[in-house]
Each structure stands twice: as C-alpha cells, then as structure tokens.
Amino acid sequence: MDDCVHKTVGSAARTERTALAVRAVLEGRRRGASMLLPFAGPAVVVSVAYMDPGNLATNIQAGARYGYALLWVVLLANVVAMLFQSLSAKLGIVTGRNLAELCRERFSRPVALAMWVVSEIAAMATDLAAFLGGAIGLSLLFRMPLLGGMVVTAIVTYGLLLLEDAGFRPLELAIGALVGIIGLSYLAELFITPIAWSSVLAHTVSPRFPDANALLIAVGIVGATVMPHALFLHSGLTQRRTPARTERERAVLLKFSNIEVVVALAIAGLINMAMVIMAAGAFHHGHPEVAEIETAYHTLAPLLGIGAAGVFLLSLIASGISSSVVGTMAGQIIMQGFVEFRIPLWLRRAVTMAPSFAVVALGVNVTQALVLSQVVLSLALPLPMAALLWFTCSREVMGAYKNRVFIAVIATLAACAVLAFNAVLILQTFGVDIPGLPG
C-alpha cells in the first residue's frame, strides 16, 4: 500500500515539475536546448494514431505488392497530418476549448448530438483495430489463444490509463516509451532486411503510380492520414496543459507546439516509411501477395529468422496497446466535450472493448472486422475535419490567431483530397466500380 502511495506521489511530482519547467520557459527563466523538453508530450501521444495496427497492415500491403514505389505517398500523407494536428493543437491553446466543446457551444443541439454519436462510434472503431492488433501480436508471440491475448491487452491498457490520475506527465512518458519501442523495432528490422537504399531515396521523391491498382493502395494510406479521434484528442491535450497568462506566452506555446508536432509526426512518418521499406525488402520479390499481419509474421520467420519475426510482433504489441490507450483517452474527451458527461474509466474501457470481444466471440473474420473499422473511420472524418477548419479560420473563435489565407487554402485543398480518397476507399470496400479505377 505504501509503495502504491509513493508511486502515485512520485508520478504527480513529475507532472508538477513539468508544469513548473514550462512556466520557467514562458517567463524566460529557462533557456537552451533543454527548454524544448517540457513541451514534449501532446504530439507524442497523438502520433500513436499514425502508427496503429491499421497503418501497419496498409504499409505491409504497399511494400509487399509495390516495393518502394509508394514511399512518396507516405511522405506526403505525413505532411498533411502535421498540418491538421498543428491546427488542432492551436485550437486548444488559443481558445482553451477542445474541438468537441466548441462543436457543442457553436452548433445546434441536434447537430452536436449527431456529431457526438458518430464520433463515439469512430472512437470505438479505432479501438477495435488497435485492440485486436495488440491481441494478435500477443497471441502469436506467446502462442496463446486470441481471447487470451485480448485479456492481457485489456489489463495492460487499463493499467496505463490509470496513470492519468497522477497527472498528464506519467502517461505521456509511458506512451513515449511505447513509441520508442516501435521505432527501435523497425530500426532493427532495417538492419536485418536487405534494402536497396538508392531505390528508397529515388521513390521517396518520385511521385508516380506503377499501375492503376497502386492507386487503391495509396487511397488506403492517405485515407488513414487524418484520424477523427486524433483531431479531438490533440485539442484536448493542449487546452489546459499549461494555460497562457499573456499573449506573449500564448505565442511561445504555439511555437513550441508546432516544433513538437513536426518532430513527433516526423518520427511517426519515418516509422511508417520503415514499415513499407521492411515489407518491400522482405516480401516484394517472392511474396508480393502478403497483405495481412498474421501472414507477414509467418512469412517473415523463415525468410529473415525468428528474431526478425519476434521484433515485428513486439512492435505490433506496442502499437496496439498504445493506440488502444490513446483511443480511450479520445473517447473520454469526446463525451465530456459534447455532452458534458464523464463515466468511470473502467466503464469507458469496457464499452470500447466490447466490439472487439464480440468480433472474436461471434467468430467474425478479424481481417474483415478491421476493414470495416477503417470504413467507419472514413465515414466519421468529414464532420470533425470541417469543424476544425471552420473554427481555426474564424476570427470570432481564434481572434488574431485565425489561419492565414495561405494556410487556409492549403488546409482546405488537403482536406478535400483526403475526403475524396476516403470516399474512394468506402466505395471500393462495398464493391462499387469507379471509372478509371480497377474494380
């Protein structure tokens, strides 16, 4: 009991030290490279949304089927992600409100309630992909039933979520550690996998599609670029982390927030590119049909050894657990923001896990369930994306910090492109033929 109390006090102290360090930077009492560290956290947490098992499956398919040819798509998608996450962070810092709260305050009640329902369903779909991904990794690594992997994943994610009771810093550090595991795992894979680095560089900067089918894979990559829950979450993480007391402090917070977004999502982008590179090096010549996580694991072991396959599963487990935690955090922000209601953590976790257990208990094909979850996310994306653009372009909401014309135009064009790609993904999933695209 005393140990638990000591750990809780220690965790709370970390949060307090971080808040004091941020305040010291804002007041000009802390300088040098170390002044960046207290601001690291929100974007690191959000970056997990771009490294979830859904991204992993898409990247494996891209690398196995087309080698390095679609690396430029991953790079471009990551730049778009940086733009929208910076807007979400700015919204929270400038207004002191998160995206869900502003939707409730600015839109009619029926519209806000409809957005809440859709966003909650999207949060559950996010958790479905993340939770099942972590469970699959555990079941393959430890040779346990999938249901057993799900139980372990549930316990670990709930334990991590309890860290939030001690303040924001302990959970930020825990998720940062999981991101580090994912990154180091793929760094190790790059040393194990035979890679043609000259081709990697060439395809990263050469935008072209090898054939018409490659466009569909690109649609999957871009379609997962901006996740609905990430837009809600980032504004929620920044809104009260360190409130600005003056306009100067607000400007400093925005500067460091933008730096963190660029660094955190650049790391996420490099990890996504590493996923494609690993799949290309391991599967493209000889096994281009690999498209599922389980198949990738079973194919990787005889090709590169059990060590490479084990590292692959370790990254999958870290990805699934961290993504599941982040999805639950986003769901809580969505509920509090839209309907001003908070449920106990254990109940929130149970509700978000229920679809995953139902999928396994009913014998539903896991891959089909993951595909359906991505369709749900695509359907849920337009409303929060449009709301974010509307609010950040509004002088009434943002004051002097509203988007500049150049940023507004670029963000609008990027949003239209992402939504178009999502529409194609949805239509293709339901077997609708699109002129000019393969069926």
UniProtKB/Swiss-Prot annotation:
It is found in: Cell inner membrane. The keyword Ion transport applies. InterPro entries: NRAMP_fam. Coiled coil: none annotated. Keywords: Cell inner membrane, Cell membrane, Ion transport, Membrane, Symport, Transmembrane, Transmembrane helix, Transport. One of its GO terms (biological process) is iron ion transmembrane transport. GO terms for cellular component: plasma membrane. It is a multi-pass membrane protein. It comes from the Bacteria. Its main location: membrane. GO terms for molecular function: cadmium ion transmembrane transporter activity; manganese ion transmembrane transporter activity; metal ion binding; symporter activity. The chain crosses the membrane at residues 32-52, 67-87, 121-141, 144-164, 173-193, 214-234, 261-281, 301-321, 350-370, 371-391, 406-426. The keyword Ion transport applies. Belongs to the NRAMP family. H(+)-stimulated, divalent metal cation uptake system. This is Divalent metal cation transporter MntH. The lineage of its organism: Bacteria, Pseudomonadati, Pseudomonadota, Betaproteobacteria, Burkholderiales.
